[in-house]
Design a protein with these regions (language model features):
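Receiver (REC) domain active-site loop signature in two-component systems and cognate sites
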Residues: 67
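Non-catalytic signal-transmission and effector/linker regions of two-component phosphorelay proteins
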Residues: 1-11, 24, 51-55, 116-134
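Active-site residues of response regulator receiver
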Residues: 64, 94
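Two-component/phosphorelay signaling modules centered on CheY-like receiver
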Residues: 17-36
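Acidic, metal-coordinating helix/loop segments flanking the phosphotransfer/catalytic sites
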Residues: 36-60
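Alpha4 helix (beta4-alpha4-beta5 surface) of REC/receiver domains from two-component response regulators
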Residues: 74, 86, 96-112, 118, ...
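Acidic catalytic/metal-coordinating carboxylates
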Residues: 39-42, 70-77
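Conserved acidic carboxylate
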Residues: 14
Length: 134
């Protein structure tokens, strides 16, 4: 039996392994493929590899802000400076999300931790739908 590729593929960038695993599980239960990264540098590397395989993947990035080595803000700056990956929308998932203006990061949306799984799913689906349309 051939395994079908998920319709939506999302990258989750989160330094806390437990949170990353929970987000991954929630998205996979919704039929989405997930690529994980523990910080911004790892995310940039994996994002390039995904884009080389398929220019439409991932359809969105769920991004923590407070991470060691390369923060979410630094990741976003580097992402926007790179034409190959600049168009992938981000969803800020952070305990400080309420203090951030998504305009500052050109984010698609923000979800505050602790998060409601249904809200996260709805926002990710909307980002992926809009990403596919553009």
């Amino acid at each position: 039996m051939t395994q079908q590729r998920p319709l939506s593929h999302v990258m989750v960038v989160e330094d806390d392994r437990d949170t990353r695993e929970v987000v991954k599980l929630i998205l996979e239960m919704e039929g989405m493929g997930v690529t994980e990264a523990a910080d911004g540098f790892e995310a940039l590397d994996r994002l390039h590899k995904l884009r080389e395989l398929d220019p439409h993947r991932p359809c969105a990035i769920v991004l923590d802000i407070m991470m060691p080595r390369c923060s979410g803000a630094e990741f976003r700056k580097r992402q926007l400076d790179d034409p190959l990956i600049a168009d992938v929308p981000i969803i800020v998932l952070s305990a400080i999300a309420d203090q951030l203006r998504t305009d500052d990061l050109h984010a698609f949306a923000r979800v505050a931790k602790p998060f409601d799984p249904d809200q996260l799913i709805k926002v990710v689906r909307r980002a992926c739908d809009e990403s596919v349309e553009s």
